A protein has these predicted regions:
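Short, well-ordered coil/turn segments that N-cap beta-strands
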Residues: 29-33, 55-57, 96-100, 130-132, ...
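Acidic (Asp/Glu)-rich catalytic clusters
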Residues: 25-27, 48-55, 81-97, 123-129, ...
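Glycine/small-residue-rich loop that forms an oxyanion/phosphate-binding "nest" at active or ligand-binding sites
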Residues: 93, 99-136
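C-terminal alpha-helical cap/extension of soluble enzyme domains
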Residues: 5-12, 208-274
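N-terminal amphipathic alpha-helix/helix-capping segment at the start of soluble metabolic enzymes
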Residues: 1-46, 271-274
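Glycine-rich, proline-tolerant flexible connector loops at the mouths of alpha/beta enzymes
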Residues: 58-92
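Catalytic beta/alpha-barrel core
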Residues: 36, 58-66, 103-105, 130-143, ...
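Active-site mouth loops of central-metabolism enzymes
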Residues: 28-46, 106-117, 160-171
Length: 274
């Protein structure tokens, strides 16, 4: 029997469906708005309630921030937190009106989870039992096998790469995207800190190149004040999604706009394309 959040069969070429039935969205066509929720159980409850009135398409649960609320900034064993994580994953999946992308962002890539490769893979596998999509950090040892295991659980995979210090060279970005594609990820995501307008332009160029090179959705983001415009104009270069904040709540990365701000710009861009 398929997982209740498994993607619909045989999506159109280049399209990936996250979720199912009333809770689903397609990546690879119209740019989707992803809104992160984070924090401890009380904060999550308030944010999940607010989802009903926002114009987002997908919710990203930053599970690493929940883990941090339990254990702080310490390396942990998966067995110590697995059941608490599963209970919260079930709550978010059941309560959210939107399809869920579950993410454990590790400290190595700017997140709050301190996990070695084995513990990271164990917890991501567990999340795949609840969420329609799961983020997999491509730089982790065992990421290719983990992608296969997430697929077997019925969830889609957003392979990700983050650099909070700067924007890598064009060749390195191309190698990272090629590795994601080779590993069989459904969606390719990269986010880099833009320390200049030139960095932001290179991220957009990499986004446009990958969109043409690979028959799967690509999400390219330049973080920081110099990169903020890429969150709004990336749709014109084939970006499958952009991340935005719930009004009154903090974002998950530097440079994010609110859902309403992003939606207003996307509406204008899409109207100009009609």
């Amino acid at each position: 029997m398929p997982h209740p959040s498994a993607p619909d069969p045989d999506p159109a070429p280049g399209l990936v469906t996250i979720g199912k039935a009333a809770k689903k969205a397609s990546l690879g066509g119209r740019t989707q708005v992803i809104v992160p929720v984070s924090g401890d159980a009380a904060a999550l409850s308030g944010q999940v309630e607010a989802l009903a009135s926002c114009r987002a398409d997908i919710v990203e649960w930053r599970a690493d921030t929940f883990l941090s609320s339990l254990v702080g900034a310490h390396f942990v064993s998966a067995s110590d937190v697995e059941e608490d994580l599963a209970r919260m994953a079930r709550y978010v999946a059941d309560s959210s009106p939107l399809p869920v992308l579950a993410t454990i962002r590790t400290s190595v890539e700017g997140g709050e989870a301190y996990l070695d490769d084995e513990e990271y893979c164990a917890l991501v596998r567990r999340l795949a039992s609840f969420a329609g999509g799961v983020d997999v950090e491509i730089s982790r040892d065992g990421s290719s096998a983990l992608i296969d295991e997430v697929h077997e659980a019925g969830a889609i995979v957003v392979a990700s790469f983050h650099d909070f210090e700067g924007t890598p060279g064009d060749e390195q970005l191309a190698e990272v995207l090629a590795a994601m594609n080779y590993a069989g990820a459904d969606v390719l995501k990269f986010a880099c800190m833009a320390n200049s307008a030139t960095d932001a332009a290179r991220v957009l160029a990499a986004q446009a190149w990958a969109h043409e090179a690979y028959d799967r959705p690509v999400i390219g983001i330049a973080m920081g004040s110099s990169g903020a415009p890429t969150r709004l104009v990336g749709s014109a270069l084939g970006s499958a999604a952009t991340f935005a904040t719930l009004p009154g709540w903090e974002g998950s990365a530097p440079g994010q706009f609110t859902v309403e701000q992003v939606r207003a710009v996307l509406d204008i861009v899409e109207a100009s394309e009609d």
